[in-house]
Amino acid sequence: MGFWHRIRGHVTSWAFLVPFLAFALFPFYWAIITSFKADANLYDLRRNPFWFAKTDAVTHQPYHKDIIVPASYPAAPIHWEIKQGDHTTRSDSEANPKPIARIGDQVVYSPVDGTLSQIEVPEGSTARPVDVIGTIEVENPTVTHYKFLASTPFYRWMQVSLLTGLAVVILTVLIAVPAAYALARLKFHGNRVIGIAIFLTYLIPPTILFIPFSQFVGALHVDNTIWSLILSYPTFTIPFCTWLLMGFFRSVPKEIEERALLDGATRMQMLRLVVIPVVLPGILTAAIFAFTLSFQEYVYGLTFISSTANRTLPVGISVEMVRGDVYFWGPLMASAVLGSLPVVIVYGLSLDYFISGMTTGAVK
C-alpha cells in the first residue's frame, strides 16, 4: 500500500511539474532553435515551427538562394565572388521558383548560411544582366546568425555590460555591507526610520528618476560614457541590497561579536573576520541581484548612451538589429542566447547560495 501511495504521489507531482517546466522552458527552446534556423526555414510557415526543415513546403526542393547578375554587369565571362556577410537576392517569385542548378560540379555554400565561397562561370560562358547564374544551397541548421554577430558590435556591447555589471557589484557591496551592518547592529537615534526609508526608496520606479539623473550625469560630463551607468545603477541596487543584508546581520548571534571584541578585535576586524564569513550567502545574493539588474537594465542605457560602441547589450540588440518594423529574428535570437549566458553562468555557479540567501534574508 505504501509503495503505490508513493507512486501516486510521484505521478501527481510530475503531473503538475511537467506543464510548469514546459511553460517555463519553452521560450528558451524557441530562442535556441530559432537562432540556428536558416531564414528560408524561419519564414516558411507551412513547415513544423518546432524543428528544422530541409526543403521548401511548396516546391519540395532544398532551400536555396538564387545568384543573379546585376543589371550593370557587362555580357562577358564572369568571375563571381561573394564577400563574407553579403546577402544574395532571389530573381524569381515564390509562385514560380526556378529549379536548383549548380555551376559546373561545384557544391557552393552561401556565405550567409554557410561558408565563404566563390563561384566561377565556366570559361567562354556568358550571362546576360539579371540572369540567374546559379544557386547557393542553404544549410539548415546553420550557425549563420552567430557568425553575423561577429560583424556587429555585439561583443563590444557584451564587454560594456559585463564591465558595468562588475563595477556596480563592487560599489554596491562596498556601500551596502557597512550600511546594513550599522543599521542592524549599531544603536543610534533614527536607525529604524533610516532602514525603512532606504527600502522605500527602492520602491520608487527607476523610470521616474532618469530625467533628473540625465541632468546629473550631464553636469559631471560623463554622459555617453560607461560612467553614467556605473554612477546611476547603484542608486537602485544599494537600497535593496542594504535592506536584504540587514536581515542577515540581525541573524548573527551577538555572542559571537561580543567574544571577538573581548579577544581584542576592533569593530572592523570583527566585521571582516567574523561576521562577513557568516553572512557570505547574503552578500553573494546581493551581488547576484546587483549584477543581474545592471546587466539587463534598458531605460537608463537607452537614455544616457547614444554612441553605438558604448551601448549596453540590451540596448544595442534592440536598436541596431531592428529596422523600423523589420525584425531580424535569427540574429536577435542568437544575440539573446549569447546575451543570457553570463546571467545563466552566475546563477548556475551560485544557485545554492542564492536560494539560501533569499530565503534566509526574507525570514530573518
What are these model-derived regions, one by one?
Residues 2-93, 98-364:
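A structural signal for multi-pass alpha-helical bundles of membrane permease subunits
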